[in-house]
Each structure stands twice: as structure tokens, then as C-alpha cells.
């Protein structure tokens, strides 16, 4: 019976084909020595004193402030630059004043001076043409002096009037320019004050956050 089972099993088993497997070359592995890093030896937390931790947090806070706060010289330069950054109001007013004086000189003062020179020349010609009589010469001289005095008084009055008018106009324009500059100064100071408050608030929040982080890192977690 056993022989029959062996014969039947030998008949039913399929023929297996032998496959040749080529061996893969094996390269030797290089063994690099591993560096063993020893953790820093910290003192046990039970030996730390609370006063030491507080002093460490206090000394660390100015260091963080020194890195966060800008240099005072740079802040002063920025503030000066923002305070004195004005428009061209005053130079424009001065240019208008100079242009007005130039126009008055060309339109009014120069023709008036030429007219007075011609009048003086004509009076001198009349005086030279008069006969050498004492009475007539005295009368003509008195008339000429009176005319000259009247002309000079008229010219001085006109000049004073024009100077007052131009001075009032220039003062009004200067006052307007000063008002504009004061408004701009107030706006600039307000914006600087707001920026200062915002910076202080942000620095306070950063300082509190940094101090909390330092305390959390140094103090033991309960």
C-alpha cells in the first residue's frame, strides 16, 4: 500500500525546472565611528534658587531690549528729518516779493526817476537862460526849490505808500505760510507721537512674551 502511494505521488508531481541564479557582488561596508555627544551637565533643579532665576531673567531683559530698540542717534535723525521736511511755501513767497519789487522798479520807479531828471534838466536850462538879474534869479530859484521839494515829497510819499502796501502783503503771505507750517508741524508731531506709542506697546508685548518664555525655559514645570 505504501509503495502504491509513493508511486502515485511520484506520477502526479510536476517536473520543476532548475534556474541558475547569478550571485550579486557584495561590497564591504565601511564602518564609520559614531560620535557620541554627551548632553550638557546641568545642575539638578532642586539646587536652583528662585533668586538666581529672577536675576537671570532681569539681566536677560535689558539685553533683549538693546537688540529690539533702535539706536538713539538714528531715531533722532529720523525725527529731525520728519520735523523739518517742509514744502516750498517760504521760498515761493520770497520769489514773489522779489518779482514784485523788480516789476515796480521797471514800471514805476525808473520812469518816475527819468521824468524827474528831465524836469531837473529843464529847470536848470531855464535858470541858465534867465538874465542875470538878482530878483528874477531869486524868484526862479525859489520856484525851482519849491518844485523840487514838492516833487521829492511826492516821490517819498509814493515810495512810503508802496513800501507799506508791499510790506503788508508780504507779512500776510508770511503769516499764511507760518500757519501752514504750524499745521504741518502739529500733524507731524501727532504722527510721531502715535508711532512712539505703537512702538512702546509692541515693545512691551514683546518684552512680556520674552520674559514669559525665559521663565518657562528656566523654571521647572509644575
From Swiss-Prot:
GO BP: proton motive force-driven ATP synthesis
Major subcellular location class: plastid
InterPro entries on file: ATP_synth_b, ATP_synth_b/b'su_bac/chlpt, ATP_synthase_B_chain
GO CC, one annotated term: proton-transporting ATP synthase complex
Record keywords: ATP-binding, CF(0), Chloroplast, Hydrogen ion transport, Ion transport, Membrane, Nucleotide-binding, Plastid, Thylakoid, Transit peptide, Transmembrane, Transmembrane helix, Transport
Subcellular location: Plastid, Chloroplast thylakoid membrane
GO MF annotation: an example: ATP binding
Source taxon at top rank: Eukaryota
Keyword tRNA processing among UniProt keywords: no
Transmembrane segments: 83-103
Membrane topology summary: Single-pass membrane protein
Pfam families per record: ATP-synt_B
Transit peptide: 1-75
Record's miscellaneous remark: In plastids the F-type ATPase is also known as CF(1)CF(0).
Function per UniProt: F(1)F(0) ATP synthase produces ATP from ADP in the presence of a proton or sodium gradient. F-type ATPases consist of two structural domains, F(1) containing the extramembraneous catalytic core and F(0) containing the membrane proton channel, linked together by a central stalk and a peripheral stalk. During catalysis, ATP synthesis in the catalytic domain of F(1) is coupled via a rotary mechanism of the central stalk subunits to proton translocation.
Family: Belongs to the ATPase B chain family.
Assembly and oligomerization: F-type ATPases have 2 components, F(1) - the catalytic core - and F(0) - the membrane proton channel. F(1) has five subunits: alpha(3), beta(3), gamma(1), delta(1), epsilon(1). F(0) has four main subunits: a(1), b(1), b'(1) and c(10-14). The alpha and beta chains form an alternating ring which encloses part of the gamma chain. F(1) is attached to F(0) by a central stalk formed by the gamma and epsilon chains, while a peripheral stalk is formed by the delta, b and b' chains.
Protein name: ATP synthase subunit b', chloroplastic
Amino acid at each position: 500500500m505504501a509503495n502504491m502511494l509513493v508511486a502515485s505521488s511520484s506520477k502526479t508531481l510536476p517536473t520543476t525546472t532548475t534556474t541558475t541564479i547569478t550571485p550579486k557582488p557584495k561590497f564591504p561596508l565601511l564602518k564609520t565611528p559614531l560620535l557620541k555627544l554627551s548632553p550638557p551637565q546641568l545642575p539638578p533643579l532642586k539646587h536652583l534658587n528662585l533668586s538666581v532665576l529672577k536675576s537671570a531673567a532681569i539681566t536677560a531683559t535689558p539685553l533683549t531690549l538693546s537688540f529690539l530698540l533702535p539706536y538713539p542717534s538714528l531715531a533722532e535723525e529720523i525725527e529731525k528729518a520728519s520735523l523739518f521736511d517742509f514744502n516750498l511755501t517760504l521760498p515761493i513767497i520770497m520769489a514773489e516779493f522779489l518779482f514784485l519789487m523788480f516789476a515796480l522798479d521797471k514800471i514805476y520807479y525808473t520812469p518816475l526817476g527819468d521824468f524827474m531828471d528831465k524836469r531837473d534838466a529843464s529847470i536848470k536850462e531855464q535858470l541858465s537862460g534867465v538874465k542875470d538879474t538878482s530878483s528874477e534869479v531869486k524868484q526862479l530859484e525859489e520856484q525851482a526849490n519849491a518844485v523840487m521839494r514838492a516833487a521829492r515829497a511826492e516821490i517819498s510819499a509814493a515810495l512810503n505808500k508802496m513800501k507799506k502796501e508791499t510790506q503788508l502783503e508780504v507779512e500776510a503771505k508770511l503769516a499764511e505760510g507760518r500757519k501752514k507750517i504750524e499745521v504741518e508741524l502739529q500733524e507731524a508731531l501727532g504722527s510721531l507721537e502715535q508711532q512712539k506709542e505703537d512702538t512702546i506697546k509692541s515693545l512691551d508685548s514683546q518684552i512680556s512674551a520674552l520674559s514669559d518664555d525665559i521663565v518657562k525655559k528656566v523654571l521647572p514645570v509644575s
